[in-house]
């Protein structure tokens, strides 16, 4: 995120971080959401950046919706990811941040009232570039693109799939 923070992007970054924290600390879903809402979302008075790990301008409803849905639907999301991942990359082998990012992206792709698939893919690709310098962003793009075509084929009707 450059100088101008995009609130929906900030919400997605926070959701990835919250999913990571919940998995690593084995904290309850609601405890993690409450911690983020109280201590991590929104800028401190007189500051407008990401000081002290805060995420300014995040939309709390979108953040909460992604975290709740990704956690509650993990038993549906994980098999989708396992199928989309290369065989040599089991879900458990992935970096925990990458796993959280893919779960959040897959969760949004499953939301029928969510943004168009290309928006979801681009948002999480941008987030992946913020966390990773290697091949992970390409992996995110490929996996989320495959899931988008599987979950919302009507939005890709008439396109040839590149291979």
Curated annotation (Swiss-Prot):
Keywords, comma-separated and alphabetical: RNA-binding, Transcription, Transcription antitermination, Transcription regulation
GO biological process, one term: transcription antitermination
Claim: Flavoprotein is one of the keywords in the record: no
Record flagged with keyword Transcription: yes
GO CC entries: cytosol
InterPro entries linked: NusB-like_sf, NusB_fam, NusB_RsmB_TIM44
GO molecular function, one term: RNA binding
Classification via Pfam families: NusB
Protein family according to the UniProt entry: Belongs to the NusB family.
NCBIfam families recorded: nusB (TIGR01951)
Biological role stated in the UniProt entry: Involved in transcription antitermination. Required for transcription of ribosomal RNA (rRNA) genes. Binds specifically to the boxA antiterminator sequence of the ribosomal RNA (rrn) operons.
Name of the protein in its database record: Transcription antitermination protein NusB
Organism name: Granulibacter bethesdensis (strain ATCC BAA-1260 / CGDNIH1)
